């Protein structure tokens, strides 16, 4: 172990970008890197699905654990927003809302009563932890007549938001499917 410097100056101050802080210090966000932290990732996705049920927009939640260790949480709620953000911040303006939700700390719809009266999880942080601490994350959203998908690798956009299916004029079920593989570099 190296001895700390006798002086404490601006040279020791770090500014971490994006989800880097979560990957660097997962214990601050999910309580560590052990089994309970791994479970915390699942709970965050389930909490989001429960929020849709509690708000009266969903009735079914499905959780699947894959043979590869991945986890999928599906709800039949409204589906995460996929429309472009409108913001004075040029780093956010025009980006798909789902991308911002998955990658920007403290971005979400649970800070006031406009989208949810009751909600669980780490508001504006939870699903970002899942994304940051996973080797890969796929999010699929069905809204109106389309199914959209966005993919991430260790918290970074891997495949931008795109339409994976058009439902030929007929309205389909709505909802969100989050599938992630916890990162073996972390857990």
Task: Please state what every model-predicted region is.
Residues 34-38, 65, 122:
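Secondary-structure capping and boundary motifs in well-ordered enzyme cores
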Residues 1-46, 50, 100:
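Bergerat-fold GHKL ATPase/HATPase_c domain
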Residues 54, 64, 169-171:
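Sterically constrained small-residue positions within well-ordered secondary structures
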Residues 2-12, 69-97, 108-187:
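GHKL-type ATPase core
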Residues 21-24, 28, 51, 55, ...:
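Conserved helix-loop functional segments at active or binding sites
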Residues 35-60, 126-133:
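Conserved ATP-binding N-box helix of the HATPase_c
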Residues 25, 44-45, 49-52, 76, ...:
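Generic, well-ordered alpha-helical scaffold segments in large soluble proteins
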Residues 60-67:
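Short beta-strand/loop element within the Bergerat-fold HATPase_c
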């Amino acid at each position: 172990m190296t001895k700390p410097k006798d002086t404490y100056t601006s040279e020791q101050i770090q500014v971490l970008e994006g989800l880097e802080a979560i990957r660097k210090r997962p214990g601050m966000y999910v309580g560590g890197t052990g089994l309970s932290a791994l479970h915390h990732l699942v709970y965050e996705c389930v909490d989001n699905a429960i929020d849709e049920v509690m708000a009266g927009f969903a009735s079914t939640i499905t959780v699947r654990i894959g043979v590869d260790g991945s986890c999928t949480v599906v709800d039949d709620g409204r589906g995460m927003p996929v429309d472009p953000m409108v913001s004075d911040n040029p780093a956010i303006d025009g980006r798909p809302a789902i991308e911002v939700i998955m990658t920007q700390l403290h971005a979400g719809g649970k800070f006031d009563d406009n989208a949810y009266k009751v909600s669980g999880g780490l508001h504006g942080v939870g699903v970002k932890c899942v994304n940051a601490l996973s080797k890969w994350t796929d999010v699929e959203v069905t809204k109106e007549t389309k199914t959209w998908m966005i993919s991430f690798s260790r918290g970074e956009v891997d495949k931008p938001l795109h339409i994976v299916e058009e439902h030929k004029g007929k309205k389909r079920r709505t909802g969100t499917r989050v599938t992630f593989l916890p990162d073996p570099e972390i857990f």
